[in-house]
Regions:
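Structural and coupling elements of P-loop NTPases
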Residues: 1-268
């Protein structure tokens, strides 16, 4: 929250990611708030979570008139019309270049620290290509040695598309993450050809439907009509319907594979 900084929910979610060894990306929202203070919020994140917190963006005009930011990964200025949506991408203004370059160098150094070859190149040239930066950041996310910080005004759709682009292009693939273990302590590899295992993490009750169970496919494949064993109960359950999720919408599918997130209905 751009007004109040890290709150109890932030800290609780961070503890969960720490326990599960998951990547972390911080998102500073409500940049259009009258009381927004980006730099104070960023300082709070660094004070709590340390130097792993690395800003990717900073706003140019936080507050009620917010409509532009600098992206120090792509070294571009992003701005939006009042209705938000697709950004206008331009060169960084001359008066912001020194600040942007300083933050870019810090980002490059943090990314290079995650790979020996990248570190050697950084020592030689003090620069990395855009693709090399993505590799370094991806490894930093997987090992939790980097916590990137992004800026958005979600209600006005400013910055959201750039964040989604980053998630699609940079966030680690499931097979690049540390291995997980099942309740028996056995390693579960995200292999679509391995035996099927699902991890159910949420149940929601919806009108006219009842229970909707959300899960991640940890290994193998799951199909509509499959009979799987509920390891908590020791009983068989049939996956009568299978969906993938797109926001509030459910899309019926016939198969999901390791790494996919989906949902089903009316399990016992």
């Amino acid at each position: 929250n751009g007004q109040y900084g890290p709150e109890v929910g932030t800290q609780n979610h961070f503890r969960y990611t720490e326990k599960l060894g998951k990547p972390v990306i911080f998102l500073i929202n409500q940049l259009d708030s009258e009381k927004c203070d980006y730099h104070q919020v960023l300082d709070s994140l660094i004070n709590i979570y340390g130097p792993k917190v690395i800003p990717i963006q900073y706003p140019l005009n936080e507050g009620p008139d917010f409509n532009s930011l600098i992206d120090v990964l792509l070294m571009k200025k992003y701005s939006w019309k009042p209705e938000g949506g697709a950004p206008i991408i331009e060169d960084i203004p001359a008066e912001e270049m020194d600040k942007a370059m300083e933050m870019h160098r810090a980002l490059v150094e943090a990314a290079a620290e995650n790979d020996e070859e990248l570190m050697e190149k950084f020592f030689d040239t003090e620069a990395l290509t855009e693709d090399e930066l993505r590799i370094g950041i991806r490894r930093g996310l997987a090992t939790r040695s980097m916590f990137p910080v992004f800026c958005v005004c979600a209600t006005k759709d400013m910055g959201v598309r750039r964040l989604m682009e980053f998630l699609g292009n940079v966030v680690p693939f499931v097979d690049e993450m540390p291995q997980v273990h099942n309740t028996r302590g056995e390693e579960v590899k995200p292999d679509p050809n391995a035996p099927t295992s699902l991890y159910f993490f949420k149940t929601a009750n919806e009108p006219h439907i009842g229970g909707v169970q959300y899960f991640k496919v940890m290994s193998g494949k799951v199909h509509e009509g499959d009979d799987l064993t509920n390891t908590d109960r020791g009983s068989k359950e049939r996956i009568a319907q299978l969906f993938c999720c797109a926001g509030a919408n459910r899309i019926k599918v016939e198969e999901l594979v390791a790494g996919d997130i989906g949902c089903t209905v009316k399990l016992k």
